[in-house]
Design a protein with these regions (language model features):
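Long, charged/polar, soluble alpha-helical segments
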Residues: 120, 124, 130-131, 305, ...
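Outer membrane beta-barrel translocator domains of Type V secretion systems
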Residues: 116-297, 402-403, 408-410
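Extracellular beta-solenoid/beta-roll
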Residues: 1-47, 51-111
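Solvent-exposed flexible segments
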Residues: 285, 297, 302-308
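Short secondary-structure subsegments characteristic of cysteine-rich extracellular domains
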Residues: 56-72, 184-199, 320-326
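Outer membrane beta-barrel transmembrane domains
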Residues: 201, 291, 320-424
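Solvent-exposed, glycine/polar-rich loop segments of beta-barrel outer-membrane systems
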Residues: 10, 122-125, 129-132, 181-187, ...
């Protein structure tokens, strides 16, 4: 069994009790497959393990696999064999009619049944990789849940003398992983620039609107493959900061992602491209309470409503993949606490996250096989981290944020943000 069809093995006599023979077969046709010839007698029960070089077994019925001169035993197929979307249990049968010239018995493929597949597992290598690719696209979009500090630093004016308008730039990176039958492990870097306009300023609050554009570059690992990730995000922001320490940050974002992937399945390399689109509306509220010595605590709450969809695609193996669109709501409750002086601020933080939607459905089809996979990404995870900001001059501040998160199946291995904001 080496992936090459039409190979033969010839034996004089074969005492095959307890033995296993490995054969390659094209499941789409009943001709040209591997063939075993036993010119003399065959005794015992021999297992034939068939490995398909195609996506299904629907076309292989009737293919002759073994020809025997004098049959005194039997051939069976006791082990499952893997095709593109399902494992199959194969049934062999023998005949003495119209057999191969010079032989008395032919063993052929009589029938097959699909092994059961469910949301808990028993998916094929192809199915697990494709499920990881489409699910990983969703997790990539979900991981972009942002905060006001990560985007603008200390936005309350405590480290800036003039905060009317501002230009900001930042870099960020993240690594996340999720354990399931559709394994995904991703990391990326993202670079973003933005501009803020002062909309209104009173004695009690400041109201700023802004726009930002981000470019993402990363990679992902699946069960037996990898993906090259690219992303583009346009964001609109509406931020109100009150003098008493409260703030409300609203965001509207649209993202487009490209995933050029490749994986190994059915003994060969398979590649393709999976694109996806996501839209989100988010609201974040916080209330910084600070004492006269500079110590502060800031409870926060955030919700993000989102719509996500994977584009349909067909990989180089001929498997067509369609993802159903999904709506979700992401929630975060947390706090940061630290110390703030006229020159710098430092803090520690902790957060609780939950995905209240995340019901992701992928439909795969090839030849006559069709598989509908449901994966529940309704994860809960906790994060902790630290950060700080530094006033470089009257209008310029630098800031950073570090975070790590852990959940039952989803882990945020690390996350970092570094930014600069110039106010004028």
């Amino acid at each position: 069994m080496d992936g090459r069809l039409g190979e033969t093995m010839t034996a004089g006599s074969f005492a095959g009790d307890g033995a296993t023979l490995y054969l390659d077969a094209d499941g789409s046709t009943n001709t040209g497959n591997d063939h075993v010839y036993v010119m003399g007698s065959h005794t015992g029960t021999t297992d034939l393990h068939l490995e398909s070089t195609s996506n299904t077994w629907s076309g292989a019925l009737g293919t002759v696999l073994v020809s025997v001169g004098e049959e005194q035993g039997s051939f069976v197929s006791d082990s499952e064999t893997e095709a593109a979307l399902y494992y199959y249990n194969l049934e062999l049968a023998s005949t003495s009619d119209n057999v191969t010239d010079g032989y008395s018995t032919d063993w052929y493929l009589k029938g097959f049944t699909k092994a059961p597949t469910n949301d808990e597992g028993h998916h094929t290598t192809v199915g697990r990789n494709l499920g990881g690719i489409t699910g990983g696209n969703y997790l990539l979009w979900r991981s972009d849940m942002d905060t006001l500090f990560r985007r603008m630093g200390e936005a309350d004016g405590s480290l800036t003398d003039n905060t009317d308008n501002g230009i900001w730039a930042r870099g960020k990176g993240k690594k996340f992983s999720r354990e399931s039958d559709f394994l995904v492990d991703s990391k990326y870097n993202e670079y973003e620039v933005g501009y803020d306009w002062l909309h209104k300023k009173t004695d009690t609050k400041e109201h700023v609107i802004g726009v930002g554009f981000a470019y993402l570059d990363g990679d992902a690992t699946y069960v037996s493959g990898k993906g090259d990730l690219k992303g583009y995000t346009l964001g609109l922001y509406d931020t109100q900061v009150w003098k008493n320490g409260q703030y409300l940050d609203l965001s509207l974002k649209g993202s487009r992602y490209e995933n050029e992937f490749g994986y190994t399945g059915l003994g060969r390399f398979i590649d393709g491209q999976s694109n996806s689109t996501g839209f989100s509306f988010g609201a974040e509220y916080g209330y910084k309470k600070k004492d006269e010595k500079g110590w502060f605590v800031e409870p926060q709450a955030q919700v993000v409503l989102g719509h996500f969809r994977n584009d349909a695609f067909t990989d180089s193996n001929g498997v067509h993949v369609e993802g159903e669109s999904l709506n979700t709501a992401l929630g975060r409750i947390g706090a940061r606490a630290g110390y703030e002086s006229p020159r710098f601020a430092v803090y520690a933080k902790a957060n609780w996250y939950h995905d209240f939607g995340g019901n992701h459905v992928t439909v795969m089809s090839v030849d006559t096989d069709r598989l509908r996979v449901h994966e529940d990404y309704g994860d809960t995870w906790f994060s902790y981290g630290l950060g700080g900001a530094y006033k470089i001059n009257d209008g310029l501040q630098a800031y950073f944020d570090l975070e790590r998160g852990d959940g039952s199946s989803y882990d945020e291995n690390w996350s970092w943000d570094v930014g600069l904001r110039w106010s004028f």
